Amino acid sequence: MRRARYIFVGALFLVLMVLVHGGAELQASLDPPGPPAEGTVAALQAWLTSGLPAVAHTAAYYRVIFSIWATIFLLTPALCFHIFSRSTAANTYWRAFWTAAYLAFLVHIYWAVSRVCGGDVHVVFNSKVATAAFPECLIEHPRPDFLLAAWWGLDVVLAWLITDNIKWLRAERGAVHMLAFAMFFGAFVLATKAGIVAHLLGILMAILVLGCVLIRLIVQENDPKSLIAILYVGFFQFLNLFVRWDKLPTLLGVSNLAALREVLRSKNLHNTSDIAVTEEKGLRPTVPYDPRYLCEREDDGQYNDLSKPTMGNAALNPDDPFNGPEFTQSNPGARFGRNIPLSEVDPTRDGDILDPSPRLVSNRLLARRKTSDGGDDFKPAGILNLLAAAWIQFQTHDWFNHGTPRPIDDDPFDVPIPPGDSWPGKMLVRRTRPDPTRKPNDHAGPTTYANAETHWWDASQIYGDSPQAGAKYRTWKDGKLAVDPNTRLIPLDPTGVEVTGLTSNWWLGLSLLHNLFTLEHNAICDHLIKAFPEWRDDPQKTPLEKDAQIFRVARMVNNSLMAKIHTVDWTPAILTHPALQVAMNANWWGLAGEHVKKYLGRISTSEAISGIPGSVANQTGADYCLTEEFTAVYRLHPLLPNDIAVRHFQGDRPGRTLKFEANDLNDPDLIVGPNAMTNALRDASLIDLIYTFGVHNPGAVTLQNFPNWMRRMRRRTGTKLEEMIDLAAIDILRDRERGVPRYNRFRKLFHKPPVRSFEEMTSDPELAKTLREVYGHPDKVDLMVGMYAEEPPEGFGFSDTAFRVFILMASRRLKSDRFYTDDYTPAVYTQAGIDWIDNNNMTTVLLRHFPELTPILQRTPNAFAPWKVS
């Protein structure tokens, strides 16, 4: 087949050369001296010569003209095929046409120099040469022509000698093609003496080539190694030296974000799974392959990536049937990765790990200030409601969990207590649970930590990480999860906590969302049974097999719906900048838009045009996992308020105030820990609680807005209370312990300039003064503190520095997961399941289970924005 393509193009070249020679002779014979002829032939002759220079129209002259026409005739398909050269067939045609066009160009140069310009070699080096025969030599500016010919010839030789996809060769080839296009476009379209035929050929070339570029952008995934991509990224890197992306017009800002994501994908994904295992007894075994893994998620995350079964899986506690967070086995696929080079992972790079004291930072820069009446000064985030705060914890419980820390007597951190602090006794902080696959004295690479949850976006906070966990919450009938038929609530275990996948750090907000999406799972089951009644009625299957089929698909649909809600509802609510509204919808639907995706399906393999779901999975050079830096930027505890004043749905009446802390754990107003939902429902309905969360604001993610009740918590294990903790101080300490760089170093590693002063870090002079007193130098400021101090872009609920990590990892969670890419198909989800995901969002989920909210949610464009009561 390849030989046939070469023969075809070679034959076309020979035919064109015959036509050039014969046509020139014929045209010269029809162009005698004297008055112009009349008739059809004369009209054709006049059209062909229209706009050409008034010189002697000999056969040699016409060979020059016709040979350059033949060159552009062959060059146009060469340029078009080059755009699609990742295809084997297109690459073959490109090589053939590129070579043929070059040979035609050499013929043109031969006739131009040897015949028209009298064989004067000076024409190669001079901008204009005239001869006695041709006072106006056609080659007015030959130097670029010959430079192009030399470069083009070199590339033709390379095209036949080197077939490997080498980076420098791709860049060189892209450059010479762009030069050829620019020069031929200039000579054929912009030159005043080119003639009407040349103008038409140049315009046709431009239309076809630019059309192919457009088609390429639409139908194929972007190649970040292409010259166009390199220039695209380089343009925005240069532009950002003068103006930040969020200051650009919307579409230009979206393009800037896409360029920034390419930079981050190429420079900010670093494997820890390659670090050798040195503790064999801590290595978790890989389960054998089963064909069912092709179309269903495993509880522990194995076999999501079929080529690397352990990629992104959870660490394991083989002694706990529910795979609890006190894991004792793991493998490299469960490790947290890094968004910074491994050589940068050093807990002591920026000084002593306890300097300055995390407690001092907590007291002076994080704690909510006291008001005149002795309360805590709460700074609200006016763009969000409290559901948004609950939602992000609901999601992070799915994503990451470093496990139960080491025991309090196992070499804890002894945090210095500032003078005059009221903290009772010593502040001892447990260390992070170590990676079981590495010995404590292993210095072959940076310290690594394992994830007690799967790294995949798989709704493990509801469905758990083990089959035994599923046995707790499933009904084993019609694929449904257990709910009380009278209250529609998840049943409680003996401790008063809902029976669901993950219940650590439990409070009312988590309870509401676990209950809501348990109801949603069951609604999806009903939808599937209606669409496929044979699933329930199939006599060839046992009741458990019928249940398993419905459960599997309902879980996949519910899981993907939550991912969609996070992408197109939650993120645009907390990032209201116009560019983000476009970009986040494009992540899911593509720039072609929701309606095109719904009614025409994917019109492109490109994630930019048709969205990530259904595109081709890509690990972008590093095994998929979540990262320590991703964990660090999701420290959003200021979102939580001091307390929650219930508002009753009917009449928006005030109710009692629910508390996050109490001296008595049996306090009926306490909504943290066991019985959180039971306490809240004492004199309120479920819809009252949903309504309350919809109308109240969470806290702003800024300095001096960390809830004080979280700075004097008692660590809870089940119903057992242990040591008192300051969560703000622990947040600071955890980043240092895990080698997350401090603020300025972090900015540099994420391609942002470091701040030079505390006044540049914050516009508040009092905060700048406090920062100076606590840290002394901007380079010592902790990442979390710097992000909270930073003035965010317009409409942002958090800093641009944190957003850098989100740009990279938000799309990676989708793009690396085959169940959102290659296997996001009706074969896995069913068409009814895909339609359910397409046609629903957070608003429709709420209305399905609480239709009374219709008047309010119809007035509210985003369910995570403050609800418009009237």
Task: Report each predicted region and the residues it spans.
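Membrane-embedded alpha-helical bundles that constitute the cytochrome b-like, heme-associated redox core
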Residues: 2-228
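Intrinsically disordered, low-complexity acidic Ser/Thr-rich regulatory segments
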Residues: 52-56, 494, 543
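Long, well-ordered mid-to-C-terminal structural blocks that present hydrophobic/aromatic surfaces
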Residues: 93-96, 103-105, 109-110, 722-760
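N-terminal accessory/cap region of cofactor-dependent oxidoreductases and related radical enzymes
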Residues: 226-527, 532, 537-541, 552-729, ...
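Acidic, glycine-enriched active-site microenvironments
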Residues: 546
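Catalytic cores of extracellular degradative/oxidative enzymes
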Residues: 549
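Short linear, low-complexity motifs centered on an aromatic residue
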Residues: 756-774
